[in-house]
Every structure is written in C-alpha cells, then in structure tokens.
C-alpha cells in the first residue's frame, strides 16, 4: 500500500467519524480550533501545517492548508520540514497534532521561524505529558510516548529511520517545551519567544473517545461538561491535562531575525 493510499484511507475514516459524532466536532471547533484562532496574529497570511482531513479549513477557509499528501480539500502539498514559502512572508503558522509526528521537529520549528514575518506566530495544539496523560498515552493510545527521545537533533536516527508517515511520539512537544527544556529549544530558535504554553483538555475529550466510533458523552451533555472543565482547569492542568496550547512569536527586532532563505521558494499568493 502506497503512502498516498494509506493516507486517503486514514483521512476518509476520520472524515466519516467526524460526520457521525457531533460532540467530537464541537470539541474540536469550540476548544481546539478556537484556541488556535484566538492565539494567532490578526490579518496577513496564515498557513496550516498537517491539514489532513480538512476540518480546520472548513472553519477557517482563508487559511492556506498544507500536508505531505495531496487531497482535493488541501491547497498545497508541502513537507513541514522544508516549507516551500519565501522568508518572512507568512503571518501565522498553525497546526493541530503535527509536531509529534515529524521525524525532525527542530527542522520544522526552524522553517516556521524562517517564513514568519516579524511579529508573526507559530501556534500549535499538541499532546502534553502530565502524570495522568502519560498513563493514557502509554497504555491506551496507539502512538508511542517515549520520553527518552532526543528531538533537538536535526537528524535523529532513532526517529527518522524506518518512520512511517502516521507514526508519532506524543512526548515530543513536552520534551521540547516543558519547563526544564524550553530554554534549550529556544536557544536554537533565536528569533522566537514562547508567549504561551498552556496545558488544557481532559473530561470532554476522554469521554468522547476521540476518533473512535463509540462515545460516552452525548452532545446534549457537552456544554455542561465543557463548562465544568473550564472552571476546574486550574485544579488539574499541571497533573492531568492531555494537551497544550503553544504559541511562539517571532521577534520584531530585525537584528535578532535570521537572514537565511531556502532559495527558490515561491512567493505566497492569497
């Protein structure tokens, strides 16, 4: 089975479940996508990395949606680790569940730093490691949760060799941006400052079972569960949150910004 065929089947399955589970749509649109949109810089050009099944594009149609695989609902076929956009031309780089799937996540972060305009933002929603989420991800999720990985290496043989397109290590975002490692990561990204690292997400997503066919959360109960989750967030975010909102802003000081370009990149068109 080719990677394109595998991807089409994967996306088709997700699109089918998306249509069948209104509570899942509400969680994504009112929690995950809403956090991405509320944290971006207004105006300008926004691109989505890992557009996949096209759910975010439906909510935010002006975004330039990209993925490694060609799909009718996506705008650009692009490798997140070698983006085909000119330096300092993009206002926002947005992504949901992308960073932990990449073979060389630091290459992507450097590419985002390169293509963003001064004041532009990289905004991501990713898995996050807490004492509770580590149990969930390690024992109840199909993707790896390997805290021994070294994501700062631009070419990590332990990650890159033999990696399939949909393989993931849900520990990667925490390893890069957890409090103990954040400065190490930012030292390799001199134009970036981390303006948000906000853990969230618990009850509603767990009860919905995500992209599995079953759900323990009827849509009619979602508003109450969502309200409870928001009100109680300060009590559990440090030890039980499943996800994190990350926002990195590129410095407006031209003396800080890198002057690198990938050469041959085409200018963006609205």
Task: Report the location of each language-model feature.
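Conserved class I S-adenosyl-L-methionine
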Residues: 122-161
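Short catalytic micro-motifs in class I SAM-dependent methyltransferases
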Residues: 97-98
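A short glycine-rich, Lys/Arg-flanked "PGG" loop and its adjoining helix->strand segment in the class I
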Residues: 106-118
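Acceptor-substrate binding/catalytic loop of class I
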Residues: 164-181
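Conserved N-terminal segment of class I S-adenosyl-L-methionine
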Residues: 1-81, 242, 254-270
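A conserved beta-strand element that flanks and buttresses the S-adenosyl-L-methionine
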Residues: 94
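Short conserved loop adjoining the S-adenosyl-L-methionine
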Residues: 82-87
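A C-terminal cap/extension of S-adenosyl-L-methionine-dependent methyltransferases
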Residues: 183, 187-190, 194-270
């Amino acid at each position: 089975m080719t990677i394109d065929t595998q991807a089409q089947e994967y996306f088709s399955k997700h699109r089918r479940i998306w249509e069948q589970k209104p509570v899942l749509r509400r969680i994504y649109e009112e929690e995950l996508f809403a956090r991405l949109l509320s944290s971006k810089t207004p105006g300008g050009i926004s691109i989505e990395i890992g557009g996949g099944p096209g759910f975010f594009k439906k909510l935010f149609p002006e975004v330039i949606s990209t993925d490694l695989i060609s799909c009718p609902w996506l705008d650009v076929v692009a490798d997140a680790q070698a983006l085909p956009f000119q330096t300092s031309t993009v206002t926002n780089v947005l992504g949901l569940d992308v960073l932990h799937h990449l073979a060389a996540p630091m290459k992507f972060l450097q590419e985002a730093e390169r293509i963003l305009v001064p004041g532009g933002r990289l905004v991501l929603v990713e898995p996050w490691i807490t004492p509770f989420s580590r149990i969930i991800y390690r024992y109840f999720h199909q993707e790896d949760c390997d805290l021994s990985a070294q994501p700062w290496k631009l070419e990590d043989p332990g990650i890159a060799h033999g990696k399939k397109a949909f393989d993931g290590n849900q520990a990667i975002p925490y390893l890069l941006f957890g409090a103990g490692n954040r400065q190490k990561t930012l030292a390799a990204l001199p134009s970036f400052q981390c303006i948000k690292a906000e853990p969230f997400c618990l009850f509603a997503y767990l009860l919905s079972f995500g992209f599995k066919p079953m759900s323990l959360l009827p849509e009619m109960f979602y508003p109450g569960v969502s309200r409870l989750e928001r009100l109680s967030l300060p009590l559990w975010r440090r030890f039980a949150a499943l996800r994190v909102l990350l926002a990195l802003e590129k410095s407006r000081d031209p003396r800080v910004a890198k002057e690198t370009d990938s050469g041959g990149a085409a200018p963006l068109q609205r």
